[in-house]
Amino acid sequence: MSRALDKAGRWIGWAFFADLANGLALTFGYMFSRPVTMQYPDKEKWLPYSRYRGHHFLKRDDEGEIKCVACELCARICPCDCIEVVPYEDEKGNRRPAKFEIDTARCLFCGLCEDACPADAIALGQQYEFSSFSSRDLVIGRDDLLAKPGKAMTGGGVVAARLNTERDVLVEASEPRGYNWWRNIRRK
C-alpha cells in the first residue's frame, strides 16, 4: 500500500512542478516584454467613452433654467446618501432646488440618481479627475454642477496630453473607434 501511495505522491509532485514551471515561464516572458503602463498624465491621456459614469452635472432647459424640480428622488434612491436637496418655490410657482449638493467622496457613481430623475436634470459626465487635498473640496454645489461640461459624443481613445489652463474642458477624440489596451502584450 505504501508503494502505491509513493507513486501517486510522485506523480502529483511532478504535476505541481510542471504547473509551477509553466507559471514561471509566463512570468519571465512578461518580465522582458514592453510595459503596458499608460504614461498618464505626462505623455498621454485617456478619453472615456460616452457611456462612462464620471462627474455629475446638472442640465438646463431651452430657456436656460435649471431642469431640476427638487423632487428629491435622486437623494432618496442614492445608496450612499451623498445627495442633499433643499427645495423652494420660485416667483413663477415652480419648485426648484435652493441647495443641491453632491459629496463625490462618498459617491459610488452608480448612476441611480440619473435613472430616477423624472426631469432628466442630473447626469454623469466623462470627467474622471477628482483629486483634492481636502474632502470639503469634493462636495459640489448647485452652481458648480451647472457649470460642469456635459458629455462628449466621442471617446475611448488616447490623446497626447497637453497643459490646459482652462478648467473642465472636454477634449474630443480624433478617432471614434476604441483603443486597444493590449496591443503590446504577447499572444500565444
From Swiss-Prot:
Residues that coordinate or bind [4Fe-4S] cluster 2: C78, C107, C110, C113
Species in which this protein is naturally found: Rhizobium meliloti (strain 1021)
Residues reported to bind [4Fe-4S] cluster 1: C68, C71, C74, C117
Annotated family: Belongs to the complex I 23 kDa subunit family.
Main localisation: membrane
Listed GO MF terms: 4 iron, 4 sulfur cluster binding; iron ion binding; NADH:ubiquinone reductase (non-electrogenic) activity; quinone binding
Keyword Translocase attached: yes
Keywords, sorted A to Z: 4Fe-4S, Cell inner membrane, Cell membrane, Iron, Iron-sulfur, Membrane, Metal-binding, NAD, Plasmid, Quinone, Repeat, Translocase, Ubiquinone
Name of the protein in question: NADH-quinone oxidoreductase subunit I 2
Membrane topology: Peripheral membrane protein
Reaction(s) catalysed by this chain's protein: a quinone + NADH + 5 H(+)(in) = a quinol + NAD(+) + 4 H(+)(out)
Co-factor requirement: [4Fe-4S] cluster
EC number of the protein: 7.1.1.-
Subcellular location: Cell inner membrane
Gene it is expressed from: nuoI2
Biological role: NDH-1 shuttles electrons from NADH, via FMN and iron-sulfur (Fe-S) centers, to quinones in the respiratory chain. The immediate electron acceptor for the enzyme in this species is believed to be ubiquinone. Couples the redox reaction to proton translocation (for every two electrons transferred, four hydrogen ions are translocated across the cytoplasmic membrane), and thus conserves the redox energy in a proton gradient.
GO cellular component: plasma membrane
